[in-house]
């Protein structure tokens, strides 16, 4: 699989969803394979580097390609091969659709996200009052 696109509807405002999913302090709460994520700066801007660590202390590094508040957040690995784009659409004051789209330029996706990951994101955010 070279690309993967999944969506989730979350019963929270677009502001809350965008802030939660772009803030590195929250990543480990909804992506089980990540133990820690840090960014050079937050909120990020184009060119900001993020890095995340798995349970075996392996670090992966990414750079921000697009950052449009409450609209889209796109990153790539430093080799510019793996990309991920989060897109956000408001469906009302307390309902947001988020699309997660990941792709590679060469080869196949190693560990594509599943709907379970976005379902966990939904559960975590909706329980966060």
Predicted region positions:
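Intrinsic-disorder/low-complexity, polar/charged segments enriched in Ser/Thr/Lys/Arg/Asp/Glu/Gln
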Residues: 3-7, 49, 59, 72, ...
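Hydrophobic pocket/interface hotspot
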Residues: 17-21, 27, 52, 64, ...
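Glycine-rich portal/gate segments that line the openings of hydrophobic small-molecule binding cavities
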Residues: 38-80, 116
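Generic structural detector for well-ordered beta-strands
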Residues: 7-11, 51, 63, 87-89
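Beta-strand/loop substructures that line and gate deep hydrophobic ligand-binding cavities in soluble
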Residues: 74-128
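Hydrophobic ligand-binding cavity/cleft-lining segments
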Residues: 1-39
């Amino acid at each position: 699989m070279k690309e993967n696109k999944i969506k989730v509807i979350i019963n929270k405002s677009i502001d809350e969803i965008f802030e939660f999913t772009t803030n590195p302090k929250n990543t480990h709460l909804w992506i089980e394979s990540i133990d820690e994520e840090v960014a050079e700066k937050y909120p990020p801007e184009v060119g900001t580097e993020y890095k995340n660590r798995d349970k075996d202390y392996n670090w992966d590094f990414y750079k921000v390609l697009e950052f449009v508040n409450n609209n889209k957040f796109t990153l790539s690995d430093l080799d510019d091969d793996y990309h991920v784009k989060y897109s956000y659409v408001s469906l009302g004051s307390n309902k947001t659709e988020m699309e997660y789209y990941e792709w590679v330029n060469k080869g196949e996706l190693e560990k594509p996200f599943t709907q379970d990951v976005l379902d966990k994101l939904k559960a975590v955010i909706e329980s966060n009052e």
